[in-house]
Each structure stands twice: as C-alpha cells, then as structure tokens.
Amino acid sequence: MRHTLPIAPQFYVTAPQSCPYLEGRLERKLFTALQGEHAQKLNDTLSKQGFRRSQNVLYRPSCAECSACLSARIRVADFEPTRTQRRVMKRNADLRRNATSPWATEDQYALFRRYLDDRHADGGMADMDIFEFAAMIEETPIRSRVIEYSRPGDTPSNRPLSAVCLTDIFDDGLSMVYSFYDPDLAGRSLGAYVILDHIEIAREAGLPYVYLGYWVPGSRKMGYKASYSALEIYKGGRWQDIGQPSDHRAELHPLSVDPIAEQVARISLPEARSGDRSRD
C-alpha cells in the first residue's frame, strides 16, 4: 500500500530582519509547519536538505542576496578527535549523562538564564521567560530528548546541572537543536564536550550523522564548527566535505540565491503529491 501526505506542505517566507551572524546583512527564512502524523517523516526528509526545526516549524535560510549559512553535519564513522578534543573528553569524564523526555524544568531554566545572561545578553533569546523556554523544549511533534549533564553528587538531588541539550532524533542521526551550559565552568569547554558526547551517542545508536545546525564562513559565532573532523556542509543542493574552511566565502551578490519559487520546486517531499507548494 502506498502512503502519501494527505496535503502537500505549504512553504512561506519571513520578512527580512537583521542577521545575527554577519553584521550589516539581512536574513530571510523559508519555512513550513511541522505537524500531524507525518511530522517525523517530513522532518527526516527536509533535514537532509538543510532544514532545521524550531518548535513546530521547519526552516532554512533563504536570504535575498546571501547564501552564507550552510547546514553542517559530522560523519560519525569518520570522525577523529583532535588532541584538544580528547583532552576535553577526559576533563569531563566525571559528568553523568541523563536522557529525558522533552519536559522543561526549573533547574534547566535557571541554567539557561545564567548561560544567556553571560554569553548572549544582547541576543534574540535574551528576554525569554520560563513559559517561552518551556515551549522551546516541549513543543515538538517529532522524537526529541533533553540530554542533561550533571556533576557527581551523593544523591540525584545533589547533582547540579552542568549542561543541557535539546536533541532531535532523525532516521539518520541526531540533531542538536539547542544547547546551553554553566558559564562558571568555562575551563571544562562544555559546549565542545556536548558535541563530542553526541557523536558518541550516535555511534552507540548506529546513527551515521550528528547535525550541528548552520556553519557560517566569516562568523566568529559559528566558526568553531569547522574544528570538527569529518564535517560535511549542504551546499549547491548536495552534501559535501567541507574541505578547507577558508575556501568558502560569505559573499553578497543578488545572483547567489535562486528565486523562492525555484527553491521550493526543488525540495523533495516524502511521497508527496506534486503541485504548487509556495506562498509569499
């Protein structure tokens, strides 16, 4: 029996707003709703084409004159940690990992607030209250987990949270939706450790990829992702090895981006009916 999506998803475009990664540029996103019984299949399919999830929405950068944001993922089987990354793993070997359902807690929010206030006080999420935080964690129509990392303690109640990551589970890997950590533990390099541990989780689960979100050449905020071996980027409609990061440019040109209608026409859907799928 052939199963199809009852209604082909509609794609929309956000209004331009200030880019959080490259100064002086405007960002625009192509997005669609993620809902219903076919949400997991749609998410699995579009994630392979550079889309990311935010609550009940799948989106991909579609800026008018810029194509700098490149979806990035690590090939788990080929990953080899650097000497520095091995030291990070050793330094955090005492942390306890706990995978839970996507349910927000006060301890998570307290850590989230400390992280934002220290690292991203002027960012777009700086004003998030506990209800918005709960929505970010809990509003997921697909398989998601919250991975908590705690320091040793005598009892479960005496194990302070060190780091947290909201993680989606795809048919081909893990996607790190959002992570945050204790800013007072800077010496542990917890951001790097959470990535390294997700590579290990994927390896144990037999999943080939860990999706890191977007790598942006020229952005200091996103430059760290290029330090991981076996990194692939989604560029020109296909996944390819990143090669030398310096070979990629964040150039600004009106011909660097195809029209929205052409972008949407090339999106592969899971056994969907053909037809017009874009709306401005």
Swiss-Prot record:
InterPro entries the UniProt entry points to: Acyl_CoA_acyltransferase, Asp_Glu_LeuTrfase, N-end_Aminoacyl_Trfase, N-end_Aminoacyl_Trfase_C, N-end_Aminoacyl_Trfase_N
Gene Ontology CC: cytoplasm
Keywords carried by this UniProt record: Acyltransferase, Cytoplasm, Transferase
Known EC number: 2.3.2.29
Keyword Phosphoprotein found: no
Catalyzed reactions per annotation: N-terminal L-glutamyl-[protein] + L-leucyl-tRNA(Leu) = N-terminal L-leucyl-L-glutamyl-[protein] + tRNA(Leu) + H(+); N-terminal L-aspartyl-[protein] + L-leucyl-tRNA(Leu) = N-terminal L-leucyl-L-aspartyl-[protein] + tRNA(Leu) + H(+)
One GO biological process term: ubiquitin-dependent protein catabolic process via the N-end rule pathway
Domain of life: Bacteria
Main location group: cytoplasm
SUPFAM superfamilies reported in the protein's UniProt record: Acyl-CoA N-acyltransferases (Nat) (SSF55729)
Keyword match Iron: no
A GO molecular-function annotation: leucyl-tRNA--protein transferase activity
Subcellular compartments: Cytoplasm
Task performed by this protein: Functions in the N-end rule pathway of protein degradation where it conjugates Leu from its aminoacyl-tRNA to the N-termini of proteins containing an N-terminal aspartate or glutamate.
PANTHER family according to UniProt: ARGININE-TRNA-PROTEIN TRANSFERASE 1, ARGINYL-TRNA--PROTEIN TRANSFERASE 1
HAMAP family on file: Bpt (MF_00689)
Protein name in UniProt: Aspartate/glutamate leucyltransferase
Classification of source organism: Bacteria, Pseudomonadati, Pseudomonadota, Alphaproteobacteria, Rhodobacterales
